[in-house]
Regions:
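Short helical segment in ABC ATPase nucleotide-binding domains corresponding to the A-loop/adjacent helical element
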Residues: 92-100, 110, 114, 218
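Conserved ABC ATPase signature
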Residues: 129-133, 137
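Helix-to-loop junction immediately C-terminal to a conserved catalytic motif
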Residues: 52
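Conserved ABC ATPase "signature" region
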Residues: 107-125, 177
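The feature captures the beta-strand-to-loop junction immediately N-terminal to the Walker
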Residues: 37-39
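A short, proline-enriched helix->beta-strand linker immediately N-terminal to the Walker B motif
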Residues: 148-152
C-alpha cells in the first residue's frame, strides 16, 4: 500500500465568528485520486485554499510528505473553474509558463510542452491565443500547463463545472489518462456526484457549515467506468443519499 502523502489533522478554519471548517482529519496516499463532494457553500474551495497555504488555519496541521506545506519547495499545481490562461500568450506559451517560472532548461521544457499538448489534443492550436479557443480548449490548456510541471500534488476546484456533459466526459477521460501516466496525487473538488464516482478512487463527503467530514467512501470500480452499470448507479445513489440527508 502506498504511503500517506497528504496528512490533514484536526483542521479548523474560521472567518471572524464563522467557523467554516471544523476539526477535519484525513490523509491521501501518494498517487491517489481523491474527490471531495458536499453541499453548495460548505467550504470546499476554502478547504483547498488551506491546503495550498493561501489561507492560514486556526488550529490543526497540514503536512505534505511529512513536512509543512512550502510552495517554494513543493511542486503543487492548481486548476480552478475559472479559466486561468494568460490572454497575451499563445497556447504553447501558456502551457510552458510554469516551466519558465521554474527555469527548466529550454530543450527539456520545449519537449515536455510538445508532449503534453499532444496528449490533450492541443498541438494543432499551439500558436493560437486564448480568445480564439472554446471553453473546453481553454480548460485543456490549464490541464496541460499543470501536468507539464509534473506536479507532486494537483488540486482541482470544479474545473468542468461550466461545461456541457459531452465535453465534460471527454476532459475527464483525458484527465484520467494523464493521471495514470504521471502518478500525480489528485484532490478534486466537485458538486457533481456522478463526476466524483466516475473519476475517483475514494470520495470524502462534507457536511454543511461548520464543515466536517461526514463519510469516506472507497470507489472500487475499474476504469473505464460505465455510468449506466448497476454498481456505478448504486454507488452514485449512496453518495447522493448521504448528501441529501444530514
Amino acid at each position: 500500500m502506498a504511503e500517506d502523502f497528504v496528512s490533514v489533522s484536526h483542521l479548523t478554519k474560521r472567518f471572524g465568528d464563522l467557523t467554516v471548517l471544523s476539526d477535519i482529519s484525513f490523509s491521501v496516499r501518494k498517487g491517489e485520486f481523491l474527490c471531495v463532494v458536499g453541499p453548495t457553500g460548505c467550504g470546499k474551495t476554502t478547504f483547498l485554499s488551506c491546503l495550498t497555504g493561501a489561507y492560514g488555519v486556526d488550529s490543526g496541521s497540514i503536512l505534505l510528505d511529512g513536512e509543512k506545506v512550502d510552495l517554494k519547495k513543493r511542486n503543487i499545481a492548481y486548476i480552478m473553474q475559472e479559466y486561468s490562461t494568460l490572454p497575451w500568450l499563445t497556447v504553447r506559451q501558456n502551457v510552458a509558463f510554469g516551466l519558465t517560472i521554474k527555469k527548466r532548461p529550454r530543450k527539456e521544457a520545449r519537449e515536455k510542452v510538445e508532449e503534453v499538448m499532444e496528449k490533450v489534443g492541443l498541438t494543432a492550436f499551439a500558436d493560437m491565443y486564448p480568445r480564439q479557443l472554446s471553453a473546453s480548449m481553454l480548460q485543456r490548456v490549464s490541464i496541460a500547463r499543470a501536468f507539464a510541471v509534473e506536479p507532486e500534488l494537483l488540486l482541482m476546484d470544479e474545473p468542468y463545472g461550466q461545461l456541457d456533459i459531452d465535453l465534460r466526459f471527454k476532459l475527464e477521460d483525458e484527465l484520467l489518462r494523464l493521471w495514470k501516466a504521471s502518478g500525480t496525487t489528485v484532490i478534486f473538488i466537485t458538486h457533481n456526484i456522478e463526476e466524483a464516482v466516475y473519476l475517483s478512487q475514494r470520495i470524502l463527503i462534507l457536511t454543511n457549515k461548520p464543515t466536517s467530514i461526514k463519510d469516506e467512501i472507497p470507489v472500487n470500480l475499474p476504469h473505464p467506468r460505465d455510468v449506466a452499470a448497476a454498481d456505478f448507479v448504486a454507488l452514485r445513489n449512496r453518495v447522493t443519499e448521504e448528501i441529501r440527508w444530514w
